């Protein structure tokens, strides 16, 4: 019998089911949906449009603070060229993330998305993690929901899931105290989902996390 798991059932499986049993069940479900001979994948590309950031995560060697001589922000043309290279190998999606850059006005993000949507109409644009959305909202003095609405109107397809390691408050306080509270990350994702934007969750591991 096919049915969706309830929230309680999902939590129970996550908390108590042996991993090998979950893996086996997932394989059986995939085979039932697509057949055992079919495996799907897509080709995408990560684009880091800026390394300017004010969050200063302890584990990040990528960011540079504003004013540092190694900072960069890519031009629209540079970003478009990276997408052209993706299209040449039949890629279908970008995941574009960067730092929380206080020097970029909200219009920069809107104009970038509009330009990319015109230049690359078939590419899914998954852009700006919840942490970046919070930063954009702060600079623009808009709510995160208003930011998401306008970015969707400009052509954004979904959000990458960066920053999910911060959902554990003790971890956040230890390695990235300037990031927003876990509730903020969840709120942005819930707002995105309410607008029909795709979302995911990705996290850096190795901070002593447990199930």
Model feature map: region roles:
Residues 23-66, 71-97:
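N-terminal pre-triad scaffold of radical SAM enzymes
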Residues 4, 38-40, 46-52, 58, ...:
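Residue-level preference for alpha-helix termini and adjacent loops
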Residues 14, 45, 163:
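Small/polar loops that bind or transfer phosphate-bearing groups
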Residues 64-211:
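Conserved Radical SAM active-site core
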Residues 18, 52-54, 58, 176, ...:
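Short capping/connector residues at structural and topological boundaries
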Residues 1-20, 24, 28, 81, ...:
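Auxiliary Fe-S-binding modules of radical SAM enzymes
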């Amino acid at each position: 019998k096919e049915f969706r798991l309830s929230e309680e059932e999902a939590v129970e499986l996550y908390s108590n089911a042996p991993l090998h049993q979950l893996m086996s069940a997932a394989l059986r479900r995939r085979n039932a949906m697509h057949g055992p001979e079919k495996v799907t994948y897509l080709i995408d590309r990560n684009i880091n449009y800026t390394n300017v950031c004010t969050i200063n995560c302890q584990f990040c060697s990528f960011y540079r603070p504003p004013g540092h001589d190694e900072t960069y922000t890519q031009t629209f043309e540079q970003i478009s060229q990276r997408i052209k290279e993706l299209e040449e190998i039949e890629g279908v999606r970008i995941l574009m993330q960067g730092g929380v850059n206080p020097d970029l006005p909200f219009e920069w993000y809107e104009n970038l998305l509009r330009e990319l949507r015109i230049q690359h109409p078939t590419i899914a644009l998954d852009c700006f993690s919840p942490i970046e959305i919070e930063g954009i909202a702060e600079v623009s003095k808009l709510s995160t929901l208003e930011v998401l609405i306008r970015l969707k109107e400009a052509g954004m397809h979904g959000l990458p899931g960066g920053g999910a390691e911060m959902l554990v408050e003790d971890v956040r306080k230890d390695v990235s105290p300037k990031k927003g509270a876990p509730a903020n990350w969840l709120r942005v994702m819930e707002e995105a989902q309410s607008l029909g934007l795709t979302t995911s969750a990705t996290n850096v591991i190795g901070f002593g996390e447990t199930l």
